[in-house]
UniProtKB/Swiss-Prot annotation:
This is Apolipoprotein C-III. Residues 66-97 are annotated as: Lipid-binding. One of its GO terms (biological process) is negative regulation of high-density lipoprotein particle clearance. Belongs to the apolipoprotein C3 family. Its main location: secreted. It comes from Equus caballus. It is found in: Secreted.
Length: 97
């Protein structure tokens, strides 16, 4: 074989190998990017779900406290009228001379 043919064959082999490495490298970069994008989307979705769960928990607690305050207000109203009438009955009347 002539040296030119060997040189051309070697250059073609190097170019083919370099192109293959470049494609593999590009594929790795794209895969890494997609994995990162997928992880970011998953983290965002999880954060939103946790936020929704936390909001539901806060609403539940607030509703419970509101109901408790209403119940306490009604109970207090009933007993305050009871206590007021009890204290009026037991208040000593002024001495009549």
């Amino acid at each position: 074989m002539q040296p030119r043919v060997l040189l051309i064959a070697a250059l073609l082999a190097l170019l083919a190998t370099a192109a293959e490495d470049k494609d593999a490298s590009l594929l790795d970069v794209v895969q890494g990017y997609m994995q990162q994008a997928s992880k970011t989307a998953k983290d965002t979705l999880t954060s939103m779900q946790e936020s929704q769960v936390a909001q539901q928990a806060r609403d539940w607690v607030n509703d419970g406290l509101s109901s408790l305050k209403d119940y306490w207000g009604k109970l207090k109203g009933k007993f305050s009228s009871f206590w007021d009438s009890t204290f009026e009955d037991t208040t000593p009347s002024p001495a009549v001379a």
